């Protein structure tokens, strides 16, 4: 587990710079549990593959401001390229991306670049900002945030597979870059004050998995500085269908979907939580071109979760996934 723990050697000074040094003791205790070698039965498969990845030299240059996060050096030999490909494939399924590492294109399930293209034009400039990304997955958007000038990009996601993918990418993209990963939930972050230090807080694709969406929004607000910006992306239902959908069992084959509000209702939630200037900046029905099965994620994907006779409905008969991006400001 050494590479997981080494990730934090440069993180603690960054935390101090962000006026969150008082978090360190609590985070170290939480990480000790999260990074227990027995925490995930797949670690015996991932750890040797991660060692293989880390044995390769870091890349000479990286590109963070285009669709695929790229890292490249002198061309690898075909043998080395195949060795690296197999090591990276040990971390399947790759869900959020895409990435291109030394000529190896990791075609992820999601075109996360498409989401970023929809979100980024509406953001306040990220230049010099401290950014918190809740539910960051493999960390694709953390790199895009740095590409747009963020001073610090901190991702939070309990998935150890996602952290493993992130560490593999960071090895090539740049170990010194200020992007970090905490394999925790939002609820596990320290609540000791001051905690209102982040200029922008993202929560994308998380709210509908929360049993208490209002608590989730309030938790997000806790870490925003006064005047900071919340970016909330979640499933919604068309306004014409009412205010709220509570799926009876599964939604698009997901059994952990609790509340899907209309855009109007979601706006009311944000206002109830004390946010101002609440606006919906994007509304998009997810297509089978944006979320699909690939060589790097060869499990079922969106096409398998929709009604085979009507792609505007899920297999359970609900409206197909419609995602809204809401932006709101925390009062000064």
Curated annotation (Swiss-Prot):
> What function does this protein fulfil?
Catalyzes carboxymethyl transfer from carboxy-S-adenosyl-L-methionine (Cx-SAM) to 5-hydroxyuridine (ho5U) to form 5-carboxymethoxyuridine (cmo5U) at position 34 in tRNAs.
Q: Does the keyword Transferase apply?
A: yes
Q: Which UniProt keywords apply?
A: Transferase, tRNA processing
Name of the protein in its database record:
tRNA U34 carboxymethyltransferase
Q: What family does this chain come from, according to its entry?
A: Belongs to the class I-like SAM-binding methyltransferase superfamily. CmoB family.
Query: Which catalytic reaction applies to this protein?
Result: carboxy-S-adenosyl-L-methionine + 5-hydroxyuridine(34) in tRNA = 5-carboxymethoxyuridine(34) in tRNA + S-adenosyl-L-homocysteine + H(+)
Enzyme's top EC category: transferase
Q: Give the source species.
A: Hydrogenovibrio crunogenus (strain DSM 25203 / XCL-2)
Residues the record lists as binding carboxy-S-adenosyl-L-methionine? 96, 110, 115, 135, 186-187, 204, 208, 323
Domain of life, per lineage: Bacteria
List, in alphabetical order, the GO biological process terms annotated in this UniProt record.
tRNA wobble uridine modification
Subunit field text? Homotetramer.
Q: What is its EC number?
A: 2.5.1.-
